[in-house]
Regions:
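Short solvent-exposed coil/turn linkers within tandem alpha-helical repeat scaffolds
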Residues: 22-31, 59-69, 96-107, 134-143, ...
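Single conserved hydrophobic/aromatic residue that forms the stacking wall/gate
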Residues: 2-13
Length: 297
């Protein structure tokens, strides 16, 4: 505690010296650096509002100084860290417009990209990038990936309805996009959460157009369950058969065989029922309840 108190007093004394230097020698080549260091001392004390005020003071007094680039970039970064995205955007835009081609402008553009991804406003970033000076490139493949990443982040934050809209927008904007299968899979999950059977059938169907994709097994589980619940037993039987072929675990295979047995029985397909019951009874981990069910059929 004493060490922290000593450090705090040292920072206060340092700022007093810097203020005295700037006040007494405003035309000194060291004055602009003193103002910058004053701002940095506030940053180190986690006093972002005072730091921003100091950096803005520097920019107003020494707008053409090379140190101004660093101060302008600091302002954007501090707003960004505080979650003041709209103010950060404006600050970073000033950096890019005033110092095109600089390292600060390049870093500002990277932070702007992150901000727009966090806000799920990639179209706005694309328009901004096109309008900014400095030969900034933002090609279609990057817009594709960022649009998907933004939607995925929204889903991860539990904003399901917004994520649903964002994934649908991604699929409409990039019908051949690199993350199309991922988007369809997330829409299946959202459909399951919202008990939207039509949505699950639509997007699981899209996934199964590419049967060897990494989501096909999960898609078949959801699709078969929906078809069974909707009493589309013949369709469910076909889905459970596909699931059995793709099952990567014994539990999934057991689920598929149980589904096949029940569907075959309900559509009165005796041959399929016998085959399904025989396969189910051969399973090593069969529960007594399922064993009795297979024998009954």
């Amino acid at each position: 505690r004493d060490r922290l108190r000593s450090r705090g007093l040292g920072d206060v004394y340092k700022r007093q010296l810097l203020n005295r230097l700037v006040g007494k020698y405003p035309s000194s080549p060291y004055a602009v650096s003193a103002l910058y260091e004053k701002g940095r001392s506030y940053v180190l004390m986690d006093n972002n509002s005072q730091a921003i005020s100091s950096f803005k003071d520097l920019l107003s007094k020494y707008p053409e100084s090379p140190v101004g680039r660093k101060a302008a970039a600091e302002i954007g970064l501090l707003y960004y860290q505080d979650g003041n995205y709209d103010q950060a955007i404006e600050a970073y835009k000033q950096v890019i417009n005033k110092y095109p081609g600089s390292e600060e402008a390049r870093l500002a553009m990277l932070d702007l990209k992150s901000i727009y991804v966090d806000m799920n406003r990639i179209d706005e970033f694309a328009a901004l990038a096109a309008a900014m000076p400095g030969n900034i490139r933002f090609d279609a493949s990057e817009q594709d990936s960022l649009t998907y990443i933004a939607a995925e982040k929204i889903y991860g934050r539990g904003r399901i309805e917004e994520a649903k809209s964002s994934f649908n927008k991604y699929l409409q904007t990039f019908p051949e996009g690199a993350f199309g299968l991922n988007a369809h899979y997330y829409l299946c999950l959202i459909g399951k959460e919202q008990k939207n059977y039509d949505m699950i059938l639509l997007h699981s169907g899209k996934l199964l157009e590419y049967p060897d994709n990494p989501f096909s097994e999960e898609a078949l589980v959801m699709r078969a369950e929906v078809q069974f619940n909707m009493q589309q037993f013949a369709d469910a039987l076909a889905s459970y058969k596909m699931l059995k072929e793709k099952a990567t675990t014994a539990d999934r295979r057991l689920l598929a065989e149980t589904g096949m047995l029940r569907c075959a029985y309900l559509i009165k397909d005796d041959t399929e029922t016998i085959h399904a019951a025989t396969d189910l009874l051969a399973e090593a981990k069969l529960t007594p309840e399922l064993g009795n069910e297979a024998l009954y059929y």
